[in-house]
Amino acid sequence: MTKNIHKHRILILDFGSQYTQLLARRVREIGVYCELWAWDVTEAQIREFNPSGIILSGSPESTIENGSPRAPDYVFTAGVPVLGVCYGMQTMAIQLGGKVESSNQREFGYAQVEIKADSALIRDIKDAINPAGEAVLDVWMSHGDKVAEIPADFVTVASTDTCPFAIMANEEKRFYGVQFHPEVTHTKQGLRLLERFVLGICGCEALWTSATIIEDAIVRLREQIGDDHVILGLSGGVDSSVTAMLLHRAIGKRLTCVFVDNGLLRLNEADQVLEMFGDKFGLNIVHVAAEDRFLSALAGVDEPEAKRKIIGRVFVELFDEEACKQEQVKWLAQGTIYPDVIESAASATGKAHVIKSHHNVGGLPKEMKLGLVEPLKELFKDEVRKIGLELGLPYDMLYRHPFPGPGLGVRVLGEVKKEYCDLLRRADAIFIEELHKADLYNKVSQAFTVFLPVRSVGVMGDGRKYDWVVSLRAVETVDFMTAHWAHLPYDFLGRVSNRIINEVNGISRVVYDISGKPPATIEWE
Protein backbone atom coordinates (compact mmCIF):
# COMPACT_ATOMS: atom_id res chain seq x y z
CA MET A 1 0.00 0.00 0.00
CA THR A 2 1.60 3.27 -1.11
CA LYS A 3 1.43 6.36 1.07
CA ASN A 4 -0.86 9.18 -0.01
CA ILE A 5 1.85 11.75 -0.77
CA HIS A 6 -0.81 14.41 -1.43
CA LYS A 7 -2.46 13.88 1.97
CA HIS A 8 -0.96 17.04 3.46
CA ARG A 9 -0.79 19.98 1.08
CA ILE A 10 -0.01 23.66 1.14
CA LEU A 11 -1.78 26.18 -1.08
CA ILE A 12 0.35 29.11 -2.27
CA LEU A 13 -1.61 32.05 -3.62
CA ASP A 14 0.40 33.83 -6.28
CA PHE A 15 0.30 37.63 -6.31
CA GLY A 16 2.97 37.85 -9.01
CA SER A 17 6.31 37.81 -7.18
CA GLN A 18 9.41 36.71 -9.09
CA TYR A 19 10.10 34.44 -6.10
CA THR A 20 6.76 32.59 -6.00
CA GLN A 21 7.96 29.45 -7.77
CA LEU A 22 11.01 29.45 -5.50
CA LEU A 23 8.65 29.57 -2.51
CA ALA A 24 6.84 26.49 -3.83
CA ARG A 25 10.13 24.68 -4.42
CA ARG A 26 11.18 25.36 -0.82
CA VAL A 27 7.94 23.84 0.50
CA ARG A 28 8.56 20.78 -1.70
CA GLU A 29 12.16 20.57 -0.39
CA ILE A 30 10.72 20.38 3.11
CA GLY A 31 8.85 17.28 1.91
CA VAL A 32 5.32 18.58 1.53
CA TYR A 33 3.22 18.82 -1.63
CA CYS A 34 2.05 22.29 -2.62
CA GLU A 35 0.42 24.00 -5.57
CA LEU A 36 0.53 27.54 -6.93
CA TRP A 37 -2.83 29.13 -7.65
CA ALA A 38 -3.84 32.62 -8.70
CA TRP A 39 -4.73 35.02 -5.87
CA ASP A 40 -8.39 35.28 -6.99
CA VAL A 41 -9.18 31.60 -6.47
CA THR A 42 -12.75 30.88 -5.31
CA GLU A 43 -13.86 29.57 -1.94
CA ALA A 44 -15.16 26.42 -3.62
CA GLN A 45 -11.75 25.73 -5.17
CA ILE A 46 -9.98 26.18 -1.85
CA ARG A 47 -12.45 23.85 -0.12
CA GLU A 48 -11.94 21.24 -2.84
CA PHE A 49 -8.15 21.47 -2.56
CA ASN A 50 -8.44 21.18 1.24
CA PRO A 51 -5.07 22.69 2.20
CA SER A 52 -3.35 22.13 5.53
CA GLY A 53 -2.11 25.71 5.33
CA ILE A 54 -2.04 28.71 3.00
CA ILE A 55 0.89 30.96 2.02
CA LEU A 56 0.31 34.39 0.46
CA SER A 57 3.19 35.30 -1.87
CA GLY A 58 4.96 38.57 -2.52
CA SER A 59 4.09 40.86 -5.43
CA PRO A 60 5.46 43.73 -7.52
CA GLU A 61 2.13 45.51 -6.84
CA SER A 62 1.44 47.98 -4.03
CA THR A 63 -1.35 47.18 -1.57
CA ILE A 64 -2.16 50.88 -1.22
CA GLU A 65 -2.98 51.28 -4.93
CA ASN A 66 -6.62 51.06 -5.98
CA GLY A 67 -7.48 47.70 -7.49
CA SER A 68 -4.43 45.91 -6.13
CA PRO A 69 -5.04 42.19 -5.57
CA ARG A 70 -6.42 40.81 -2.31
CA ALA A 71 -6.66 37.32 -0.88
CA PRO A 72 -10.14 35.75 -0.93
CA ASP A 73 -11.93 36.46 2.37
CA TYR A 74 -12.34 32.71 2.88
CA VAL A 75 -8.57 32.39 3.40
CA PHE A 76 -9.02 33.99 6.83
CA THR A 77 -12.11 31.98 7.82
CA ALA A 78 -11.05 28.54 6.57
CA GLY A 79 -9.58 27.60 9.95
CA VAL A 80 -6.09 26.77 8.62
CA PRO A 81 -2.77 28.52 9.33
CA VAL A 82 -1.86 31.39 6.99
CA LEU A 83 1.60 32.85 6.30
CA GLY A 84 1.85 36.16 4.45
CA VAL A 85 5.18 36.92 2.77
CA CYS A 86 6.05 40.58 2.00
CA TYR A 87 3.02 41.76 -0.04
CA GLY A 88 1.17 38.76 1.42
CA MET A 89 1.76 40.14 4.91
CA GLN A 90 0.56 43.59 3.84
CA THR A 91 -2.68 42.37 2.27
CA MET A 92 -3.29 40.22 5.37
CA ALA A 93 -2.83 43.31 7.55
CA ILE A 94 -5.22 45.45 5.46
CA GLN A 95 -7.88 42.75 5.12
CA LEU A 96 -7.90 42.08 8.88
CA GLY A 97 -8.15 45.74 9.92
CA GLY A 98 -4.55 46.99 9.96
CA LYS A 99 -2.94 49.73 7.88
CA VAL A 100 -0.20 49.86 5.24
CA GLU A 101 1.66 52.96 4.09
CA SER A 102 4.40 53.84 1.64
CA SER A 103 7.76 53.73 3.37
CA ASN A 104 10.02 56.80 3.37
CA GLN A 105 12.99 54.46 3.41
CA ARG A 106 12.56 51.47 1.14
CA GLU A 107 14.35 48.24 1.98
CA PHE A 108 15.95 46.21 -0.80
CA GLY A 109 18.58 43.67 0.14
CA TYR A 110 20.15 42.52 3.39
CA ALA A 111 18.58 43.54 6.70
CA GLN A 112 18.77 42.41 10.31
CA VAL A 113 15.50 41.93 12.18
CA GLU A 114 15.37 42.00 15.97
CA ILE A 115 13.09 39.54 17.75
CA LYS A 116 10.78 41.39 20.16
CA ALA A 117 8.38 38.63 21.26
CA ASP A 118 8.08 34.87 21.39
CA SER A 119 6.26 33.16 18.53
CA ALA A 120 5.75 29.58 17.40
CA LEU A 121 6.99 30.69 13.97
CA ILE A 122 10.54 31.57 15.03
CA ARG A 123 11.01 30.07 18.48
CA ASP A 124 14.69 29.04 18.91
CA ILE A 125 15.49 30.26 15.39
CA LYS A 126 18.15 32.98 15.26
CA ASP A 127 21.37 34.01 13.55
CA ALA A 128 22.94 35.95 16.42
CA ILE A 129 22.34 37.85 19.66
CA ASN A 130 22.68 41.65 19.54
CA PRO A 131 24.25 43.81 22.30
CA ALA A 132 20.78 44.35 23.79
CA GLY A 133 20.45 40.59 24.26
CA GLU A 134 17.84 40.21 21.51
CA ALA A 135 17.91 37.38 18.99
CA VAL A 136 18.40 38.65 15.44
CA LEU A 137 17.77 37.17 12.00
CA ASP A 138 19.70 37.98 8.82
CA VAL A 139 17.05 38.38 6.13
CA TRP A 140 16.43 39.62 2.59
CA MET A 141 13.99 42.50 2.17
CA SER A 142 12.38 43.77 -1.03
CA HIS A 143 9.59 46.25 -0.29
CA GLY A 144 8.59 49.87 -0.74
CA ASP A 145 5.46 49.77 1.47
CA LYS A 146 5.25 48.69 5.09
CA VAL A 147 2.65 47.75 7.66
CA ALA A 148 1.99 50.88 9.73
CA GLU A 149 -0.57 49.37 12.10
CA ILE A 150 -1.13 45.67 12.77
CA PRO A 151 -4.65 44.24 13.08
CA ALA A 152 -6.30 43.72 16.47
CA ASP A 153 -5.22 40.52 18.27
CA PHE A 154 -1.86 40.53 16.43
CA VAL A 155 1.46 41.10 18.19
CA THR A 156 4.75 42.50 16.94
CA VAL A 157 7.23 39.63 16.82
CA ALA A 158 10.19 41.35 15.11
CA SER A 159 11.22 44.73 13.71
CA THR A 160 14.06 46.63 12.03
CA ASP A 161 15.11 50.26 12.45
CA THR A 162 12.93 51.27 9.49
CA CYS A 163 10.26 48.54 9.57
CA PRO A 164 8.38 48.41 12.91
CA PHE A 165 6.50 45.23 11.97
CA ALA A 166 8.95 42.85 10.26
CA ILE A 167 7.07 39.84 11.70
CA MET A 168 3.53 39.90 13.08
CA ALA A 169 1.51 37.05 14.54
CA ASN A 170 -1.91 36.04 15.78
CA GLU A 171 -1.00 32.82 17.58
CA GLU A 172 -4.61 31.86 18.36
CA LYS A 173 -5.68 31.90 14.71
CA ARG A 174 -2.22 30.81 13.52
CA PHE A 175 -1.88 33.81 11.20
CA TYR A 176 1.66 35.05 10.55
CA GLY A 177 3.19 37.76 8.40
CA VAL A 178 6.85 38.30 7.50
CA GLN A 179 7.97 41.42 5.64
CA PHE A 180 11.09 39.66 4.30
CA HIS A 181 11.50 36.74 1.88
CA PRO A 182 12.20 33.44 3.71
CA GLU A 183 12.36 31.55 0.39
CA VAL A 184 15.62 33.16 -0.84
CA THR A 185 18.98 31.81 0.32
CA HIS A 186 20.06 35.28 1.55
CA THR A 187 17.59 34.80 4.43
CA LYS A 188 19.84 32.37 6.27
CA GLN A 189 17.17 30.79 8.49
CA GLY A 190 14.45 31.05 5.85
CA LEU A 191 14.12 27.33 5.23
CA ARG A 192 13.90 26.65 8.99
CA LEU A 193 11.15 29.27 9.29
CA LEU A 194 9.20 27.69 6.44
CA GLU A 195 9.75 24.24 7.98
CA ARG A 196 8.38 25.54 11.27
CA PHE A 197 5.27 26.85 9.51
CA VAL A 198 4.67 23.84 7.25
CA LEU A 199 5.63 20.96 9.55
CA GLY A 200 5.14 22.50 12.98
CA ILE A 201 2.24 24.94 12.74
CA CYS A 202 0.33 23.32 9.84
CA GLY A 203 1.10 19.80 11.12
CA CYS A 204 2.12 18.40 7.74
CA GLU A 205 4.12 15.19 7.38
CA ALA A 206 7.16 15.16 5.09
CA LEU A 207 5.78 12.56 2.67
CA TRP A 208 6.99 14.19 -0.56
CA THR A 209 10.36 12.55 -1.38
CA SER A 210 11.95 11.25 -4.59
CA ALA A 211 11.31 7.64 -3.59
CA THR A 212 7.64 8.20 -2.68
CA ILE A 213 7.03 10.32 -5.79
CA ILE A 214 8.34 7.47 -7.98
CA GLU A 215 6.27 4.90 -6.11
CA ASP A 216 3.14 7.05 -6.42
CA ALA A 217 3.78 7.79 -10.12
CA ILE A 218 4.15 4.11 -10.99
CA VAL A 219 0.88 3.22 -9.25
CA ARG A 220 -0.96 6.05 -11.00
CA LEU A 221 0.55 5.24 -14.40
CA ARG A 222 -0.51 1.60 -14.13
CA GLU A 223 -4.02 2.64 -13.12
CA GLN A 224 -4.28 5.14 -15.99
CA ILE A 225 -2.73 3.02 -18.76
CA GLY A 226 -3.93 -0.45 -17.80
CA ASP A 227 -2.73 -2.97 -20.40
CA ASP A 228 -2.42 -0.38 -23.19
CA HIS A 229 0.67 0.74 -25.11
CA VAL A 230 2.29 4.20 -24.90
CA ILE A 231 4.42 6.23 -27.32
CA LEU A 232 6.94 8.91 -26.25
CA GLY A 233 9.17 11.30 -28.18
CA LEU A 234 12.58 10.75 -26.55
CA SER A 235 15.00 13.63 -27.12
CA GLY A 236 17.69 12.72 -24.61
CA GLY A 237 16.83 15.84 -22.59
CA VAL A 238 16.09 15.67 -18.87
CA ASP A 239 12.28 15.74 -19.00
CA SER A 240 11.72 13.16 -21.74
CA SER A 241 14.46 10.91 -20.30
CA VAL A 242 12.95 10.83 -16.81
CA THR A 243 9.48 10.33 -18.32
CA ALA A 244 10.84 7.37 -20.30
CA MET A 245 12.44 5.79 -17.23
CA LEU A 246 9.28 6.17 -15.11
CA LEU A 247 7.09 4.66 -17.82
CA HIS A 248 9.57 1.85 -18.46
CA ARG A 249 9.49 0.96 -14.77
CA ALA A 250 5.68 1.09 -14.78
CA ILE A 251 4.80 -0.72 -18.04
CA GLY A 252 8.06 -2.13 -19.45
CA LYS A 253 8.07 -3.04 -23.14
CA ARG A 254 4.62 -1.55 -23.71
CA LEU A 255 6.42 1.80 -24.01
CA THR A 256 7.76 2.74 -27.46
CA CYS A 257 10.21 5.64 -27.57
CA VAL A 258 10.69 7.51 -30.84
CA PHE A 259 14.12 9.13 -31.08
CA VAL A 260 14.40 11.56 -33.99
CA ASP A 261 18.00 12.33 -34.98
CA ASN A 262 17.58 15.65 -36.75
CA GLY A 263 21.26 16.25 -37.48
CA LEU A 264 21.18 19.22 -35.10
CA LEU A 265 22.38 17.41 -31.97
CA ARG A 266 25.70 17.67 -30.13
CA LEU A 267 28.73 15.54 -31.02
CA ASN A 268 27.94 11.80 -30.64
CA GLU A 269 24.68 12.63 -28.84
CA ALA A 270 22.50 10.30 -30.92
CA ASP A 271 24.83 7.35 -30.27
CA GLN A 272 24.90 8.14 -26.54
CA VAL A 273 21.09 8.27 -26.29
CA LEU A 274 20.66 4.98 -28.15
CA GLU A 275 23.38 3.27 -26.13
CA MET A 276 22.09 4.46 -22.77
CA PHE A 277 18.37 3.89 -23.22
CA GLY A 278 18.47 0.99 -25.65
CA ASP A 279 21.52 -1.05 -24.67
CA LYS A 280 21.90 -0.15 -20.98
CA PHE A 281 18.29 0.27 -19.82
CA GLY A 282 16.58 -1.94 -22.40
CA LEU A 283 13.93 0.50 -23.60
CA ASN A 284 12.11 -0.14 -26.86
CA ILE A 285 13.44 2.62 -29.16
CA VAL A 286 12.56 3.51 -32.75
CA HIS A 287 15.50 5.44 -34.23
CA VAL A 288 14.53 7.88 -36.99
CA ALA A 289 17.60 9.14 -38.89
CA ALA A 290 16.29 12.35 -40.41
CA GLU A 291 19.23 14.71 -40.89
CA ASP A 292 18.64 15.08 -44.64
CA ARG A 293 14.93 15.83 -44.19
CA PHE A 294 15.57 18.58 -41.63
CA LEU A 295 18.44 20.17 -43.57
CA SER A 296 16.41 20.11 -46.79
CA ALA A 297 13.54 21.88 -45.05
CA LEU A 298 15.94 24.47 -43.62
CA ALA A 299 17.75 25.18 -46.89
CA GLY A 300 17.73 28.88 -47.75
CA VAL A 301 16.08 29.90 -44.46
CA ASP A 302 18.01 32.33 -42.27
CA GLU A 303 15.36 33.95 -40.03
CA PRO A 304 15.54 32.47 -36.48
CA GLU A 305 11.80 32.18 -35.80
CA ALA A 306 11.20 30.64 -39.22
CA LYS A 307 13.92 28.06 -38.50
CA ARG A 308 12.33 27.19 -35.16
CA LYS A 309 8.92 26.68 -36.76
CA ILE A 310 10.34 24.50 -39.54
CA ILE A 311 12.26 22.31 -37.08
CA GLY A 312 9.13 21.92 -34.94
CA ARG A 313 6.92 21.15 -37.94
CA VAL A 314 9.25 18.52 -39.40
CA PHE A 315 9.63 16.86 -36.00
CA VAL A 316 5.85 16.62 -35.60
CA GLU A 317 5.48 15.21 -39.13
CA LEU A 318 8.10 12.53 -38.46
CA PHE A 319 6.69 11.68 -35.05
CA ASP A 320 3.20 11.41 -36.57
CA GLU A 321 4.44 9.04 -39.24
CA GLU A 322 6.08 6.76 -36.68
CA ALA A 323 3.14 6.96 -34.25
CA CYS A 324 0.69 5.94 -36.97
CA LYS A 325 2.75 2.80 -37.59
CA GLN A 326 2.26 1.79 -33.94
CA GLU A 327 -1.32 0.59 -34.24
CA GLN A 328 -1.50 -0.79 -30.71
CA VAL A 329 -0.62 2.57 -29.11
CA LYS A 330 -3.42 4.23 -27.14
CA TRP A 331 -1.50 6.86 -25.16
CA LEU A 332 0.95 9.67 -25.90
CA ALA A 333 3.43 10.46 -23.10
CA GLN A 334 4.94 13.91 -22.67
CA GLY A 335 7.57 15.36 -20.36
CA THR A 336 5.41 18.30 -19.27
CA ILE A 337 6.64 19.68 -15.93
CA TYR A 338 4.90 21.95 -13.40
CA PRO A 339 6.39 25.26 -14.65
CA ASP A 340 5.00 24.36 -18.12
CA VAL A 341 1.55 23.99 -16.56
CA ILE A 342 1.90 27.33 -14.75
CA GLU A 343 3.18 29.08 -17.89
CA SER A 344 0.43 27.56 -20.02
CA ALA A 345 -2.26 28.72 -17.59
CA ALA A 346 -0.65 32.16 -17.31
CA SER A 347 -0.57 32.65 -21.08
CA ALA A 348 -4.22 31.60 -21.35
CA THR A 349 -5.58 33.61 -18.41
CA GLY A 350 -2.91 36.19 -17.64
CA LYS A 351 -2.05 34.47 -14.36
CA ALA A 352 -1.09 31.15 -12.86
CA HIS A 353 -4.06 28.99 -11.93
CA VAL A 354 -5.06 25.62 -10.60
CA ILE A 355 -3.16 22.74 -12.16
CA LYS A 356 -4.67 21.64 -15.46
CA SER A 357 -3.68 19.28 -18.22
CA HIS A 358 -1.11 21.00 -20.43
CA HIS A 359 -1.56 19.95 -24.05
CA ASN A 360 1.51 20.79 -26.08
CA VAL A 361 1.00 18.08 -28.67
CA GLY A 362 0.96 20.59 -31.51
CA GLY A 363 0.13 19.03 -34.85
CA LEU A 364 -0.70 15.46 -33.95
CA PRO A 365 -3.44 14.21 -36.31
CA LYS A 366 -6.93 14.09 -34.82
CA GLU A 367 -7.50 10.56 -36.08
CA MET A 368 -4.85 9.30 -33.63
CA LYS A 369 -7.18 10.03 -30.71
CA LEU A 370 -4.49 9.27 -28.16
CA GLY A 371 -4.92 9.81 -24.44
CA LEU A 372 -2.31 12.00 -22.75
CA VAL A 373 0.12 10.74 -20.10
CA GLU A 374 2.11 13.38 -18.19
CA PRO A 375 3.83 11.77 -15.18
CA LEU A 376 5.98 14.84 -14.38
CA LYS A 377 3.29 17.52 -14.53
CA GLU A 378 3.33 18.12 -10.76
CA LEU A 379 7.12 18.44 -10.54
CA PHE A 380 9.64 21.26 -10.70
CA LYS A 381 12.85 20.78 -12.70
CA ASP A 382 15.01 20.18 -9.63
CA GLU A 383 12.58 17.47 -8.50
CA VAL A 384 12.68 15.85 -11.95
CA ARG A 385 16.49 15.69 -11.75
CA LYS A 386 16.42 14.10 -8.28
CA ILE A 387 13.93 11.50 -9.50
CA GLY A 388 16.17 10.81 -12.48
CA LEU A 389 19.07 10.07 -10.14
CA GLU A 390 16.86 7.74 -8.12
CA LEU A 391 15.89 5.94 -11.34
CA GLY A 392 19.54 5.38 -12.26
CA LEU A 393 20.19 8.08 -14.84
CA PRO A 394 23.74 9.50 -14.71
CA TYR A 395 24.39 12.77 -12.87
CA ASP A 396 26.30 14.31 -15.80
CA MET A 397 23.32 13.83 -18.09
CA LEU A 398 20.73 15.17 -15.65
CA TYR A 399 22.73 18.24 -14.65
CA ARG A 400 24.28 19.25 -17.95
CA HIS A 401 23.65 22.71 -19.31
CA PRO A 402 20.40 23.56 -21.11
CA PHE A 403 20.25 22.77 -24.82
CA PRO A 404 17.63 24.49 -27.01
CA GLY A 405 14.82 22.44 -28.52
CA PRO A 406 15.84 23.36 -32.10
CA GLY A 407 19.41 22.33 -31.20
CA LEU A 408 22.20 23.59 -33.44
CA GLY A 409 19.52 25.03 -35.71
CA VAL A 410 19.63 28.20 -33.59
CA ARG A 411 23.36 28.04 -32.80
CA VAL A 412 24.30 28.16 -36.46
CA LEU A 413 23.46 31.77 -37.29
CA GLY A 414 21.61 32.26 -40.54
CA GLU A 415 21.14 29.37 -42.95
CA VAL A 416 21.79 25.90 -41.49
CA LYS A 417 24.10 23.64 -43.51
CA LYS A 418 25.62 20.26 -42.71
CA GLU A 419 29.14 21.67 -43.05
CA TYR A 420 28.39 24.37 -40.48
CA CYS A 421 26.81 21.91 -38.04
CA ASP A 422 29.76 19.53 -38.28
CA LEU A 423 32.27 22.33 -37.57
CA LEU A 424 30.16 23.66 -34.70
CA ARG A 425 29.75 20.21 -33.12
CA ARG A 426 33.50 19.67 -32.96
CA ALA A 427 34.29 23.17 -31.69
CA ASP A 428 31.59 22.98 -29.03
CA ALA A 429 32.81 19.55 -27.86
CA ILE A 430 36.31 20.99 -27.32
CA PHE A 431 34.93 23.93 -25.31
CA ILE A 432 32.82 21.68 -23.08
CA GLU A 433 35.66 19.16 -22.64
CA GLU A 434 38.04 21.92 -21.53
CA LEU A 435 35.45 23.33 -19.10
CA HIS A 436 35.23 19.91 -17.46
CA LYS A 437 39.02 19.48 -17.35
CA ALA A 438 39.43 22.91 -15.72
CA ASP A 439 36.64 22.18 -13.20
CA LEU A 440 34.69 25.14 -14.58
CA TYR A 441 31.68 23.40 -16.13
CA ASN A 442 29.60 23.37 -12.94
CA LYS A 443 30.70 26.90 -12.04
CA VAL A 444 28.90 28.41 -15.02
CA SER A 445 25.18 28.09 -15.67
CA GLN A 446 25.38 27.54 -19.41
CA ALA A 447 28.19 27.34 -21.94
CA PHE A 448 28.14 26.67 -25.67
CA THR A 449 29.63 27.64 -29.02
CA VAL A 450 27.95 29.59 -31.81
CA PHE A 451 28.80 29.35 -35.51
CA LEU A 452 29.05 32.72 -37.27
CA PRO A 453 28.52 32.66 -41.05
CA VAL A 454 31.44 35.02 -41.70
CA ARG A 455 34.94 34.23 -42.89
CA SER A 456 38.12 35.62 -41.40
CA VAL A 457 41.74 35.59 -42.54
CA GLY A 458 44.10 33.38 -40.57
CA VAL A 459 47.70 32.15 -40.79
CA MET A 460 48.70 28.49 -40.49
CA GLY A 461 52.45 27.90 -40.83
CA ASP A 462 53.58 29.77 -43.93
CA GLY A 463 50.12 29.66 -45.46
CA ARG A 464 47.14 31.96 -45.41
CA LYS A 465 43.67 30.60 -44.66
CA TYR A 466 40.24 32.16 -45.02
CA ASP A 467 37.85 30.24 -42.80
CA TRP A 468 34.88 30.49 -40.47
CA VAL A 469 34.46 32.19 -37.08
CA VAL A 470 32.92 30.73 -33.91
CA SER A 471 32.00 32.47 -30.68
CA LEU A 472 32.25 30.96 -27.21
CA ARG A 473 29.42 31.85 -24.81
CA ALA A 474 29.36 31.22 -21.05
CA VAL A 475 26.98 32.83 -18.55
CA GLU A 476 26.24 32.82 -14.84
CA THR A 477 22.63 33.13 -13.74
CA VAL A 478 20.20 32.06 -11.03
CA ASP A 479 16.96 32.00 -13.01
CA PHE A 480 17.97 32.53 -16.69
CA MET A 481 15.80 35.68 -16.67
CA THR A 482 18.95 37.79 -16.26
CA ALA A 483 22.55 36.66 -16.69
CA HIS A 484 26.15 37.87 -16.48
CA TRP A 485 28.84 36.73 -18.89
CA ALA A 486 31.23 34.39 -17.11
CA HIS A 487 34.69 35.81 -16.39
CA LEU A 488 36.60 32.74 -17.52
CA PRO A 489 40.40 32.86 -17.07
CA TYR A 490 42.35 34.22 -20.03
CA ASP A 491 44.70 31.25 -20.12
CA PHE A 492 41.69 28.93 -20.28
CA LEU A 493 40.13 30.87 -23.17
CA GLY A 494 43.48 30.87 -24.95
CA ARG A 495 43.76 27.10 -24.58
CA VAL A 496 40.26 26.54 -25.96
CA SER A 497 40.89 28.89 -28.88
CA ASN A 498 44.18 27.20 -29.79
CA ARG A 499 42.62 23.75 -29.70
CA ILE A 500 39.65 24.71 -31.85
CA ILE A 501 41.75 26.47 -34.50
CA ASN A 502 44.33 23.67 -34.61
CA GLU A 503 41.95 20.71 -34.42
CA VAL A 504 38.91 21.88 -36.38
CA ASN A 505 39.91 22.40 -39.98
CA GLY A 506 37.66 25.15 -41.34
CA ILE A 507 37.69 27.52 -38.34
CA SER A 508 40.22 30.37 -38.34
CA ARG A 509 39.07 32.58 -35.49
CA VAL A 510 37.50 32.19 -32.02
CA VAL A 511 35.85 35.09 -30.16
CA TYR A 512 34.30 35.30 -26.67
CA ASP A 513 30.86 36.84 -26.12
CA ILE A 514 30.90 39.34 -23.22
CA SER A 515 27.25 40.44 -23.45
CA GLY A 516 24.97 40.26 -20.43
CA LYS A 517 21.23 39.59 -20.38
CA PRO A 518 19.78 42.14 -20.77
CA PRO A 519 20.46 43.65 -23.27
CA ALA A 520 21.47 40.46 -25.10
CA THR A 521 19.69 37.11 -24.83
CA ILE A 522 21.63 34.03 -23.70
CA GLU A 523 21.21 32.23 -27.02
CA TRP A 524 22.15 34.25 -30.11
CA GLU A 525 18.95 33.30 -31.95
Swiss-Prot record:
What CDD domains is this protein classified in?
Answer: GATase1_GMP_Synthase, GMP_synthase_C
The biological pathway it contributes to is: Purine metabolism; GMP biosynthesis; GMP from XMP (L-Gln route): step 1/1
Q: Enumerate the UniProt keywords alphabetically.
A: ATP-binding, Glutamine amidotransferase, GMP biosynthesis, Ligase, Nucleotide-binding, Purine biosynthesis
Cellular component per GO, a single term: cytosol
As its record notes, the protein acts as a catalyst of: XMP + L-glutamine + ATP + H2O = GMP + L-glutamate + AMP + diphosphate + 2 H(+)
Domain spans labelled GMPS ATP-PPase = 208-400
Q: What is a single molecular function from GO for this protein?
A: ATP binding
Can the keyword Nucleotide-binding be found in this entry's annotation?
A: yes
Listed disulfide bonds for this chain? none
Enzyme Commission number(s) from the entry: 6.3.5.2
Provide the residue positions that the database annotates as binding ATP. Answer: 235-241
Q: Which residues form the Glutamine amidotransferase type-1 domain?
A: 9-207
Q: Determine the domain of life of the protein's source.
A: Bacteria
PROSITE patterns (alphabetical): GATASE_TYPE_1, GMPS_ATP_PPASE
Catalytic residues per the record?
Answer: 86 (nucleophile), 181, 183
Summarizing the function annotation, the protein's role is: Catalyzes the synthesis of GMP from XMP.
Quaternary structure per UniProt? Homodimer.
Q: Which NCBIfam families match?
A: guaA_Cterm (TIGR00884), guaA_Nterm (TIGR00888), PRK00074.1 (NF000848)
* Listed name of the protein: GMP synthase [glutamine-hydrolyzing]
Q: Which lineage do the record's taxonomy fields give for this organism?
A: Bacteria, Pseudomonadati, Pseudomonadota, Gammaproteobacteria, Enterobacterales
